[in-house]
Amino acid sequence: MKKLLAVFLTASLLACALPALAAEEVNVFNWEDYICDEVIDLFEEETGIKVNYMRFTTNEDMLVQVQADPKNYDVIFPSDYIIERLISEDLLEELDYSQLPNAQYTLDWLKTPDYDPEGKYSVPYMWGTVGILYNKTLVSAPITSWTAMWDEQYVDNVFMMDSIRDTLGVALKMLGYSMNTRDMDALNEAKDKLIEQKKAGIVKAYQVDETKDKMIAGEAAMGLMWSGDAAYAMSFNDDLAYVVPEEGSNVWVDGMCIPKGAKNYENALKFIDFLCRPEIALMNFEEICYCTPNSGAIELIDDPEVLADETLFPSDET
């Protein structure tokens, strides 16, 4: 009987101890193809924290998931306008910068951006532009204007984004409006232009991540694309070129945030700070080709041609 009691007590004690022995983790919700896989491995090896990595394809998909239950995620990667919305809905935790020493490398102009004026809720991850990636062998002349995406000579030859913000923004810019306008007449006019484009059969497909591979394969004359994906595609196909049209475009920023009530807040801070290390930020830049907001990483780039590439590092004029 004593032996049975001892076994029972031992089992009970082990059961009580199991939660404390459980492996630490961090739940990350990021875009498709938006991190160097080796970076995750390095973080896990250094910290012993397991990264549960989940992916989304649009800001809107991510927003719905976070609104439904923010506690499911510890680190998310929303774009600027979604960060602003998440702040307004009280769905983000304030960041403890005492645990983010590598945030010091953030470029000055991104430390207190309009969408997060005090920089309390987000650390920039990547930034870039929206433009047109086109195949020089499949267009009649170099592309300079957004109107090219409505040109009927390119029927069934244009990829548009499956992104309300960017697709509507392009139509607004083509019509001479701000991408951020809230004027309903302007928004309805832009909506009508997009309907007109679709009815004319110009759009081959509405998609996001697939466009870069299909442009590499020469499957369309042009596609609406973010600058990083364009740079990646051009590295595989010399016939491709990227342009920010003369009417102007959107400079966007994707940030790293911690949702309200995150279960692993401390681990989330460790993950964000790890990504802000200059050498780690450089690894991500080299892998995904988006513009890094990390001054330390930029200093590590020793190729002047890379620094001069306006697809990778847009100038003030762009």
Region locations from a protein language model:
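Mature extracytoplasmic/periplasmic domains
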Residues: N250, D254, P259-E317
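Early extracytoplasmic/lumenal segment of secretory-pathway proteins
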Residues: A23-R85
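Periplasmic-binding protein-like
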Residues: N188-Q197, F236-K260, E305-L307
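A ligand-binding cleft/hinge motif common to bilobed small-molecule-binding domains
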Residues: I82-R85, I216, M222-D239
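Ligand-binding "clamshell"
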Residues: I87-E94, D116-K120, Y232-V244, V306-A308
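Bacterial N-terminal signal peptides
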Residues: V7-C16
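Extracytoplasmic ligand-binding site segments that recognize negatively charged/polar headgroups
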Residues: C36, N72, F77-E219
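Sec/Tat signal peptide C-region and signal peptidase I cleavage site
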Residues: L18-A22
